[in-house]
């Protein structure tokens, strides 16, 4: 992070996937996913009280920002809670919104955060399926994917997403096989600019010839 007005440092490298406030761990004791408190928060327990004290003196409000389902630490610790592509690969940097453990964790975390830190506003980032294009850190892509390829690689086929699809009458296995087939074809042929533009214009209608995927 660039902290241009900081008297101590101009660039700050944060810990990954940790909480920068004093979590009430009792709220999480019966949950599978557990938060980890940042070293900064442990070393500076008076940070938030001092911040609110100083901002109140100056008539300022305090807003916060937290990243929700984009947590590689949690993904590595609980890989089954992640988005899984059509090949069954875990996308470690993105927890799946359909996963009940993920939902319980996020609801508890946000409730605890808003209780412990009385912010005037809170921005929630990545409360969604992030997509393949977001990727991780310093990826090497020697091919260059089309918009269609990126979309197909972004569809989650974890057990919970497939169960929800089946509950809606969708043949999730057939949809997964359709993604396999389309990605294999795209890797063997040159996907033209015109076809890519047609995908962006038609959106879901592009898959009308793949009933399970279109559903």
Question: Over which residues does each language-model region extend?
Answer:
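Hydrophobic faces of well-ordered beta-strands that scaffold small-molecule active sites
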Residues: 1, 62-66, 122-124
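Aromatic-lined carbohydrate-binding/catalytic grooves of carbohydrate-active enzymes
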Residues: 1-43
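Short, flexible, mixed-charge acidic loops at enzyme active sites
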Residues: 8-25, 75-86, 137-139
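Generic structural signal for well-ordered alpha-helices
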Residues: 48-53, 110-114
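Short, well-ordered coil/turn segments that N-cap beta-strands
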Residues: 56-62, 118-120
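Active-site-adjacent "subsite" loops/lids of carbohydrate-active enzymes
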Residues: 63-117, 134, 141-167
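Extended, charge-rich helix/loop segments that form flexible
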Residues: 145-213
